């Protein structure tokens, strides 16, 4: 993917990533079908079911979709306890699903050809980067970093340790800088403004 590729908007991802608009299609978790992955035209025509998994954190870039599978459509009862949760990649038509990780995903974002993943499990939070082919997994932080707001190869996020300042991570170098010493949460950077 080109380095300026971003998988979804911060607004969508900060609201569980149930929608993603990409290349003339809207990909979405259909609430009327157990949050199963669907696509449609922006005019709400040509609706197609793309799989049987319940999904969230939908990302798109290049030839692929990425999503966190939260279960199988219609999971209920004791069977829901065995449901495999995974972060997956598939073609834009929903075919050729590949499991990228079984880590419990809090938020993920696609920047260029890398996935930036925030996971939280019994061992605590972990923020890492891996290539879209599952290679080169690199731990970046052992605290929460929300990668939702990405613009031009930079991830903007709020502090979660000692403050809630606005930070910027350059995805080319993994270098971090402080942008603003204020108090904010779930930043959305658009143009020259931070919301």
Report the location of each language-model feature.
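N-terminal "mature head" segments of proteins
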Residues: 1-38, 43, 47
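Repeated scaffold domains used in trafficking and secretory/extracellular systems
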Residues: 12-21, 52-62, 102-112, 142-152, ...
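Short, solvent-exposed loop/turn segments at conserved positions within beta-propeller repeat blades
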Residues: 30-34, 74-85, 120-125, 159-164
